């Protein structure tokens, strides 16, 4: 009976996965050894034997050799990356980005968190969520020394000074005199904790992980990106398309002067397309150039295309609120006419909830604002028509404008 059960014994295989860019397998652990195979980032290797700081593995081609443990991740960490991919497989894309250089996908935000897959520079990624964590101190940095509040020459031990005369010693022991207390040395307030932003991203193959935000360039068309005015453009969403045939048919009634219809400006005439051209209109969201903010954006700006001037113009602008991704683009029909729409959440108070694991921030009391685009006009729609209360001082935006004007 026992022998029959042994036939159903399942052999459990242990695997590790290459986290280094590339690494050679060696035939033995020694100062002098031979290379037997080259493995690359993401390769799965079957474990044959564990050594001290080394592991013996077999490749999918049957090649066997040793490599250092720090060049691979184990099954448990690999499973965490797989779970992260499954959990966010259906998350909406809030923006598209391009990597500035080669970057590792991390399982959580943070420079010291485990990483696995290496994404090549210039790769396109889908951006899913923004998280904020404390910035790791640079290597070798020491904590600031505590301020010394003792006065020079003061004896803080509570014992008589052995270098003082005997009469002074006896006096200090028998009847210590209370000296007037010196005012405490003012202590500088602690410096604010440095924070840094990370993006949860998904690559073309569906691999998911966290990347340092300042190493990812958001894919924003240059035509609207130039109007950022010193702010960080978080995303640009196409909302509508218009056909510019160069005739300047934006207004039904041309302005009149004493001699008839006013001709189009020479500048507008020069900008008119030679042939009909389709132009895209955008909803953009922006934020100050800071990390660690308790919101994703604090400004929304709609760029519409002027058929008279043949350029982008601001169709709508709102700033000074706490906005949160994603921005949803849609359509609605009213009286037989279909209009493009957009909506997003804002906070009604400074209270936010922060995920302790990944630093993703969400409003405790959110509101959803809805808008639709009617030609070149943006109108507010939806059930919530209450006034929009600004929840923070948009001083950063104003400072950026002032600095720009000063340069001019």
Regions found by a protein language model. Give the residues of each.
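C-terminal motif of bacterial Sec signal peptides marking the signal peptidase cleavage site
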Residues: 2-4
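Short, Lys/Arg- and Gly-enriched loop/turn segments at beta-strand edges
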Residues: 52-58, 133-144
């Amino acid at each position: 009976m026992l022998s029959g059960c042994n036939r159903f014994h399942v052999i459990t295989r242990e695997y590790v996965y290459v986290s280094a860019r590339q690494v050679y397998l060696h035939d033995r652990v020694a100062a002098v050894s031979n290379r037997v195979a080259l493995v690359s980032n993401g390769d799965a290797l079957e474990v044959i034997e564990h050594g001290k700081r080394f592991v013996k593995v077999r490749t999918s081609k049957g090649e066997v050799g040793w490599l250092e443990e720090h060049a691979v991740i184990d099954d448990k960490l690999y499973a965490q990356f797989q779970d992260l991919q499954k959990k966010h497989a259906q998350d909406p894309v809030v923006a598209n980005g391009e990597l500035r250089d080669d970057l590792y996908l991390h399982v959580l935000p943070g420079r010291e968190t485990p990483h696995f897959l290496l994404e090549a520079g210039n790769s396109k990624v889908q951006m899913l969520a923004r998280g904020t964590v404390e910035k790791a101190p640079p290597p070798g940095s020491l904590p600031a020394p505590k301020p010394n509040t003792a006065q020079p020459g003061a004896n803080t031990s509570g014992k008589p000074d052995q270098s003082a005369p005997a009469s002074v010693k006896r006096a200090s022991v028998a009847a210590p005199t209370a000296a007037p207390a010196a005012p405490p040395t003012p202590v500088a307030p602690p410096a604010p904790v440095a924070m840094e932003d990370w993006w949860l991203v998904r690559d073309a193959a569906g691999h998911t992980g966290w990347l340092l935000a300042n190493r990812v360039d958001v894919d924003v068309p240059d035509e609207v990106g130039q109007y950022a005015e010193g702010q960080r453009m978080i995303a640009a969403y196409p909302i509508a398309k218009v056909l510019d045939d160069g005739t300047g048919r934006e207004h039904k009634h041309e302005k009149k002067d004493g001699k008839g219809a006013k001709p189009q400006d020479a500048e507008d005439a020069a900008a008119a397309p030679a042939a009909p051209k389709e132009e895209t209109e955008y909803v953009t969201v922006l934020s100050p150039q800071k990390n660690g903010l308790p919101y994703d954006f604090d400004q929304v700006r709609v760029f519409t295309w002027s058929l008279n001037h043949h350029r982008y113009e601001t169709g709508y602008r709102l700033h000074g609120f706490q906005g949160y991704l994603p921005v949803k683009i849609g359509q609605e029909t009213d009286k037989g006419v279909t209009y493009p729409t957009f909506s997003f959440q804002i906070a009604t108070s400074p209270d936010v909830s922060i995920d302790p694991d990944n630093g993703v921030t969400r409003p405790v009391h959110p509101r959803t604002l809805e808008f639709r685009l009617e030609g070149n006009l943006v109108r507010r729609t939806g059930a919530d028509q209450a006034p929009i209360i600004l929840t923070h001082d948009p001083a950063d935006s104003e400072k950026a404008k002032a600095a720009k004007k000063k340069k001019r």
